[in-house]
Amino acid sequence: FLLKVAYNGWIKDHCVTLEQFTSLVYDLTGVTVENQLKMPGGMDAVLFLAEPDHLFDPKLWSAVKVSGKNDGASEFTIDADYFAQNALTNCELINLEDMLQNGTIMNGVMIEKPHRFITACTIATQIILAVTSSTYGGATVSLAHLAPFVRSSYEKYYKKYKENGLSKEQCEKFAKEDTKKEVADGVQTFNYQVNSMTNTNGQAPFLSVCMYLGETDEYKEELAMIIEEFLNQRILGFKNEKGVYITPAFPKLLYVLEEDNIHENSKYWYLTELAAKCTAKRMVPDYISEKIMKQMKVDANGDGQCYPCMGCRSFLTPYIDPVTKKPKYYGRFNQGVVTINLVDVALSSGKDLKKFWKIYDERLELCHKALQVRHERLAKATSDIAPILWQHGAFARLPKGASIH
């Protein structure tokens, strides 16, 4: 059905037979269907799939023109054409810790736990590419999930020098030097990969990187090393085609202000100074106050929580995993966004405040219905539609064919 809709909407105009088009869509994963049903054919599919009659109303689509009408009432964000693919979620916090520590599967190949920092960086970027190719929003990863592999690298170097008969002091000195060099190489690899690879959305992954010392106690020193290197490399910038250093678009940086780094006499004050220097030159990182966030994000246990925003800059709501009874943020996502055009509501009210709120309530209800349609579409999917998300750790580890609802 979807293939015929897409074919009738656009493919036919390009002199491709239905049989030829169907033969292209041999793999019914979300990624493959996504690329075959993108605008404008996917738009026709959306109108067939948005079953409730009120969602056929062109007022719902301010971002796209339906029936030649676009009055800007509300917006089915980000792209309505993605709605035709029922398993595509929007933004997420990738559970990089689980995927690196317990392994994952990509393209049918088992990727086991890495044993060096630079290897972990390479695998992380491949995970980011796979995940962002199976979604349509922004993603965030935490550098705390990479920190344990810095220690793994240090231990390997230390063991090498010890086996060569060096003293403890020499082993520590040379192992630290080698580890620092590997951290620099790993961060450079990460940055180059993120900026040079293209996902199935036809763009570099819309990625944010979280720098939160409070996420780990055991590997805080290693995390500080990674944060320092990320900031130094961002200050330097990337060379463009003319060899001039410029500000790279991605990854975005998220720096958390906490007791360990906000006072001049605190241990990690030097990182905050470096972050400020980076902001002055490159307009990143963005800053999150641990103190204020813990006041605003209180979970069901009564505990304040601090965690990064998703790539889209929106924050998940506090949540307690019913199985572990612990807060859960990584491996969560949002299902999609619908936006009210407040300017249009104001203009439509004719300066009548009561009419403004009446129109506002109507538009808000329409947005809620649109969100419910997104939820219902997603709830029908199985884990097979995006294995990297649902089967191999980015969101969950469900069996094949299991419902994601």
Residue ranges and their predicted role:
Residues 4:
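A domain-level signal for the structural core that forms small-molecule/cofactor-binding pockets
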Residues 7-405:
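Conserved catalytic cores of very large enzyme subunits
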